[in-house]
């Protein structure tokens, strides 16, 4: 064997482990990509049902119907004594109520517990007669009659309870924006007093699209 053949054979011997190393590395990279894709799909699946503190609250839950948008309002209940009630009518901004004949399809309520939340609350939305003063007795009767769904939200060690949303469908009622003043959000504090720094309610009213201004405010 001459010198050139000896040198070539030596190179071939040195290359073999490198080829094996590349093969093992490629296999490892492929496995990592598959695992990453599986984790990504799992995270998307979990996120679909996971409550979020992002506002507006249709994000991460229900999509608006075609041709519809929504208006959000935020309610912060006052202190509610143990076993007592609170009610607040839905008051939309004037820029929305001027289109009072636009249909409303759904109302969504999301309960956002603040860090000090350690209570159990019941939340619902009801059509309330204009003559009602939303007294404790009146609200108590509305919770008891079973005429609308009720969301029960209670303290969880994680700080967030999975079922923090209530969706109220008004499609069959042909309700419009002008009717919203007839609806109220009702809260019952079951186990102890609900303090003012424990809870925030986000209410989304899904309605037909309305014209928006193209001029900046003065």
Curated annotation (Swiss-Prot):
Residues 11-21 have a biased composition (Basic residues). The modification N-acetylmethionine is found at residue 1. Keywords: Acetylation, Capsid protein, Ribonucleoprotein, RNA-binding, T=3 icosahedral capsid protein, Viral nucleoprotein, Virion. Pfam families: Cucumo_coat. It comes from Cucumber mosaic virus (strain N). It is found in: Virion. The keyword Ribonucleoprotein applies. The lineage of its organism: Viruses, Riboviria, Orthornavirae, Kitrinoviricota, Alsuviricetes. The N-terminal arginine-rich stretch does not seem to be the major RNA-binding region that allows formation of an infectious ribonucleoprotein complex. Residues 1-30 are annotated as: Disordered. The keyword Repeat does not apply. GO terms for cellular component: ribonucleoprotein complex; T=3 icosahedral viral capsid; viral nucleocapsid. Residues 1-10 have a biased composition (Low complexity). One of its GO terms (molecular function) is RNA binding. Belongs to the cucumovirus capsid protein family. Capsid protein. Probably binds RNA and plays a role in packaging. This is Capsid protein.
């Amino acid at each position: 064997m001459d010198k050139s053949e000896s040198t070539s054979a030596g190179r071939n011997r040195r290359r073999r482990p490198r080829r094996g190393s590349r093969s093992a590395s490629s296999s490892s990279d492929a496995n990592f990509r598959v695992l990453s894709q599986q984790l990504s799909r799992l995270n998307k699946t979990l996120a679909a049902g996971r409550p979020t503190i992002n506002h507006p609250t249709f994000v991460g839950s229900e999509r608006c119907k075609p041709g519809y948008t929504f208006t959000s309002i935020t309610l912060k209940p006052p202190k509610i004594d143990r076993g007592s009630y609170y009610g607040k009518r839905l008051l939309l901004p004037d820029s929305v109520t001027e289109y009072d004949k636009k249909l409303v399809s759904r109302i969504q309520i999301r309960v956002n517990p603040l860090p000090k939340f350690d209570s159990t609350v019941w939340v619902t939305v009801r059509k309330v007669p204009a003559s009602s003063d939303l007294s404790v007795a009146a609200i108590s009767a509305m919770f008891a009659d079973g005429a609308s769904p009720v969301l029960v939200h209670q303290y969880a060690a994680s700080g967030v309870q999975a079922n923090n949303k209530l969706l109220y469908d008004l499609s069959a009622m042909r309700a419009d924006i002008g009717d919203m003043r007839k609806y109220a959000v009702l809260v019952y504090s079951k186990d102890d007093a609900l303090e003012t720094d424990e809870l925030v309610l986000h209410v989304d009213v899904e309605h037909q699209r309305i014209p928006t201004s193209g001029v900046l405010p003065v």
